[in-house]
């Protein structure tokens, strides 16, 4: 059974711009690199069977170390919510024959490679979610069994399945943080 990593990085980043940010939040500098470079590199370094980056609102640079390991998936419906990006990534994973995906966000540079690995290895239930000090976050592993339960549009993804079917979920304690960089203040706080 093969598993693909999916980094969702298609949104418009409107909250960052509204908070005074210049340009897209994913392209903001965080500890010497862009926010999205950290997220992609951490996912790719987990060495799952494939790594997909879903993009839409902006073109994204690839980190130098991940160029050979990453494939872009285009989501032209990114404005219809994060669920469309998840569906775009899952469609690609299904086409490529993967039986599960581990999904994370491009604006979460503090999610460590070890979190991607731990969640990917947790296969005793159809859904595995990273926890940080007992709080659920990203990434989330989704077996193909639950893909039909995911929404097609809107700003919710795996949370809907976890809320409706808690019996399918295993929590996985992970190092790091699942903090989003949504505003200029977030960027300053975590830098």
Describe the predicted segments one by one:
Residues 138-142, 179-181:
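Short glycine- and hydrophobic/aromatic-rich loop-to-beta-strand nucleating segment
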Residues 2-136, 144, 149, 166-175:
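Nucleotide and nucleotide-moiety/phosphate-recognizing core
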Residues 1, 5, 148, 153-191:
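Conserved alpha/beta core of the MobA/IspD/sugar-nucleotide pyrophosphorylase nucleotidyltransferase superfamily
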């Amino acid at each position: 059974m093969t598993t693909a990593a999916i980094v969702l990085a298609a949104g418009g980043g409107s909250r960052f711009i509204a908070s005074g940010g210049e340009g897209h939040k994913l392209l903001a500098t965080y500890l010497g690199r862009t926010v999205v470079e950290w997220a992609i590199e951490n996912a790719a370094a987990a060495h799952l069977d494939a790594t997909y980056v879903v993009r839409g609102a902006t073109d994204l640079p690839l980190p130098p170390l991940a160029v050979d390991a990453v494939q872009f998936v285009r989501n032209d419906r990114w404005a219809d919510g994060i669920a469309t990006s998840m569906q775009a990534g899952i469609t690609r994973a299904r086409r490529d024959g993967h039986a599960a995906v581990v999904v994370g966000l491009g604006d979460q540079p503090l999610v460590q490679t070890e979190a991607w690995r731990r969640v990917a290895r947790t296969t005793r239930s159809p859904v595995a979610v990273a926890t940080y000090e007992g709080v659920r976050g990203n990434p989330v592993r989704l077996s193909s069994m639950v893909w039909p339960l995911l929404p097609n549009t809107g700003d919710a993804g795996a949370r809907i399945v976890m809320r409706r079917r808690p019996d399918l979920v295993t929590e996985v304690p992970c190092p790091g943080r699942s903090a989003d960089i949504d505003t200029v203040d977030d960027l300053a706080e975590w830098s």
